[in-house]
């Protein structure tokens, strides 16, 4: 019984399905409730530009507010920025890691004859805007890393996002993923920007208090 209780306690408050790596983040900060349309538009553009300046980011698309809906209302001061970040290594058309040709100086060779620094072993190298079509596939070569040396995990990318999106009058946001966040919203059934949890011993009294 003790052993069974230990395993039950260990897995309490956990879901059967583990958290998936979606390859993207959902940034949901908010600004001042009284801010106008033009101000919210300006802040949203600043957020998009700040996130896009991170080398590991592929695309970022943001929006302010949502249409008036009883299911999921959101004012203009609530932002949603969907951020797609690059995979750690360059992938081929099948979505698998591909090795690319390097020369004797450990530089990646491009199809046009140019050479670029290898981000795998160069600490201070600036990542170049290199497309997969520019590199030469070679099974004896090396993987081309899309992330800087100091970026070792998606958490590091999120920390960079938090750092660059610290704007006056804008709140911070927890680390979210788009699909995971939508599933949580559907499970909770929240239909307002703010919710109150009511607990008690009698369901009828809880219902009466909530209504």
Residue positions per predicted region:
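Surface-exposed amphipathic alpha-helical segments in non-transmembrane regions
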Residues: 2-11, 26, 39-59, 74-211
């Amino acid at each position: 019984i003790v052993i069974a209780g230990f395993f039950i306690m260990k897995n309490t408050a956990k879901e059967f399905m583990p958290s998936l790596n979606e390859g993207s983040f959902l940034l949901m900060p908010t600004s001042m409730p009284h801010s106008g349309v033009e101000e919210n538009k300006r802040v949203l553009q600043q957020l998009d530009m700040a996130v896009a300046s991170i080398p590991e980011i592929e695309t970022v698309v943001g929006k302010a507010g949502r249409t008036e809906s009883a299911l999921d209302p959101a004012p203009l001061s609530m932002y949603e920025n969907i951020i797609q970040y690059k995979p750690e290594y360059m992938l081929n058309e099948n979505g698998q890691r591909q090795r690319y040709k390097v020369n004797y100086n450990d530089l990646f060779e491009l199809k046009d004859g140019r050479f670029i620094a290898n981000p795998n072993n160069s600490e201070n190298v600036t990542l170049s805007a290199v497309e997969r079509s520019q590199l030469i596939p070679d099974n004896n070569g090396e993987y081309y890393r899309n992330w800087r040396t100091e970026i070792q995990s998606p958490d590091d990318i999120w920390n960079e996002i938090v750092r660059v999106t610290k704007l006056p009058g804008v709140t911070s946001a927890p680390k979210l993923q788009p699909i995971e966040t939508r599933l949580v919203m559907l499970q909770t059934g929240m239909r307002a920007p703010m919710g109150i949890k009511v607990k008690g011993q009698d369901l009828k009294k809880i219902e009466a208090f909530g209504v």
